[in-house]
Amino acid sequence: MQPISWRERLQAYYYLCRFDKPIGTELVFWPTMWALWIASDGYPDLKMFVVMTLGVLFMRAAGCAINDFADRKVDGHVARTKQRPLATGIIRPIEAIWVFLALVAASAALLLFLPIETFYWSFGALFLAFIYPFMKRYTHLPQVFLGAAFSWAIPMAYTATGQAPDLTCWLLYFGNLAWTVAYDTQYAITDREYDLKIGVKSTAILFNRFDIPIISTLQLSSLLLIGMALYIENLLFPWGIIGLVVVAVDFIYQWTKTKNRDPQLCFWAFRHNRWVGLIIFLAILAAFRF
């Protein structure tokens, strides 16, 4: 391959970090904001908001870089991922590692503005971000590890505000984890035929013909857990109920689209989950304001 210009290299890094595809950032950002708003009694500090937002952005990008490093030998065999920078060879594996480390360092710098407890919790975030991409080789439950990683910012938001993670925090955590496994299983269905050929494991393969019913069960579980958290914080009536009903209708709509397991429609449903987190956040915001 011919040498590439710095402009092309920077563009490859941009794609490596998925800055062109912000949905992953949104899926982490909104649950983080649920926790930040609730832990702050509806009035988070601006500095805290900025720090947590940048942390989500940096760590999600770091996760993408290490994910592509882990998948560099299989992405070329999957239609959806064969144009990723590492799969095409436009950048080297060592460059993905350096990008990952740089983003982790940027995230670590943000911890200087947060309490020491948040620093301790950050080791869990780093551990989960690093191991998740490799889990799909050893277990059919990589989506559970992704759910744990995507939800880790929830207890971190609590500690960032000086609060100890309480029952509400853990209800939000496991509610978000269930939702994450649901939408990432939708995502995995789109690649299932390729994953079966190349030996990549996923919940879509594990659940097999029960995939759609299990996704619906996970979505219902997430609504119940998040609803319990809102109830404890006196945020359920009426705005929390309104938000959760809207989300339930959206989940039903997703089911109508995915029940036949069309890969393109399953991918559409996955992307549609970006609205779920926003709707719940708006419900929390309204409950504090009205």
UniProtKB/Swiss-Prot annotation:
Keywords: Cell inner membrane, Cell membrane, Magnesium, Membrane, Transferase, Transmembrane, Transmembrane helix, Ubiquinone biosynthesis. Catalyzes the prenylation of para-hydroxybenzoate (PHB) with an all-trans polyprenyl group. Mediates the second step in the final reaction sequence of ubiquinone-8 (UQ-8) biosynthesis, which is the condensation of the polyisoprenoid side chain with PHB, generating the first membrane-bound Q intermediate 3-octaprenyl-4-hydroxybenzoate. The chain crosses the membrane at residues 23-43, 46-66, 96-116, 118-138, 141-161, 169-189, 212-232, 235-255, 265-285. GO terms for molecular function: 4-hydroxybenzoate polyprenyltransferase activity. This is 4-hydroxybenzoate octaprenyltransferase. The lineage of its organism: Bacteria, Pseudomonadati, Pseudomonadota, Gammaproteobacteria, Moraxellales. One of its GO terms (cellular component) is plasma membrane. CDD domains: PT_UbiA_COQ2. It is found in: Cell inner membrane. It comes from Acinetobacter baylyi (strain ATCC 33305 / BD413 / ADP1). The gene is ubiA.
